[in-house]
């Protein structure tokens, strides 16, 4: 299924926010990926707004970033 422009913009904003949070926590892509057992490339693609993450992926990110 194709993603429209508004959805793409939302994914890009989400990715930017995740990247900002990761950097504020002082984590590299590799460190975050290791802590949540995900591939660093998948997190990179998420931060670039190139993928639509599942709910469980977002839960894992919240745990890895220590977000309540």
Cite the ranges covered by each PLM segment.
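Short basic helix-loop element that most often maps to the first helix and adjoining turn
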Residues: 16-35, 60
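Recognition helix of helix-turn-helix/homeodomain-like DNA-binding domains
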Residues: 37-51
């Amino acid at each position: 299924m194709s993603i429209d422009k508004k959805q793409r913009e939302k994914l890009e904003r989400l990715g930017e926010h995740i990247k900002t949070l990761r950097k504020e926590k002082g984590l590299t892509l590799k460190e975050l990926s290791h802590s949540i057992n995900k591939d660093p490339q998948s997190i990179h693609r998420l931060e670039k707004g190139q993928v639509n993450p599942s709910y469980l992926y977002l839960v894992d990110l919240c745990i890895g970033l220590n977000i309540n």
